[in-house]
Amino acid sequence: KTSFKATDIIIIANPIRTADGLHKKRRIVSITEVRKEWEEDPLRENGFVDLMRYNPKTDQLEMTDNLINGDSDIIKSIASNVKEWAGNWDAVWDNIMLRASIKKTLVETATKIKNPLLLEAEFTIRSNDEFHRISDSVREKYEIIDTKRIYFEWNEWLKKQIKLKNSFA
């Protein structure tokens, strides 16, 4: 009855067969939020809300309408603790998309320069720290969270790190 009450998010990974049927690849197939308002059966009482689902045609995890439309108690709870996000789903969504763009750029860059160290914990931590430093700097300087400016400055930082090469080796 209460086994899911202490759980916020469930991430499910399963092996997925390739089109030829001969191979399997492990994929995250869903990211599901666990709501807290149910009493007896979370399945019958809409206690589970999918935020992302795997699409086998695109071989990608895709956002659901629930996530896009801000129907996430967890994200709203986190946002309520950030002055610029509280009650402003558009600002929250812009920040989610900014972070997604940064992660995508890191993956694409690591692939392009054939350096998987860009995706390892050490560089990811440095990248996140720089993202937060730039975000704070932009907010202080312009009094708004300008996601385009933040991305531009972060991307310039990334280019400098790649030129230094030894910064992630």
Give the predicted meaning of each segment:
Residues 87, 91-169:
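Terminal-proximal interaction/regulatory segments of ATP-powered molecular machines
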Residues 1-4, 25:
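Amphipathic alpha-helical transducer elements in NTP-driven molecular machines
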Residues 8-102:
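Conserved P-loop NTPase
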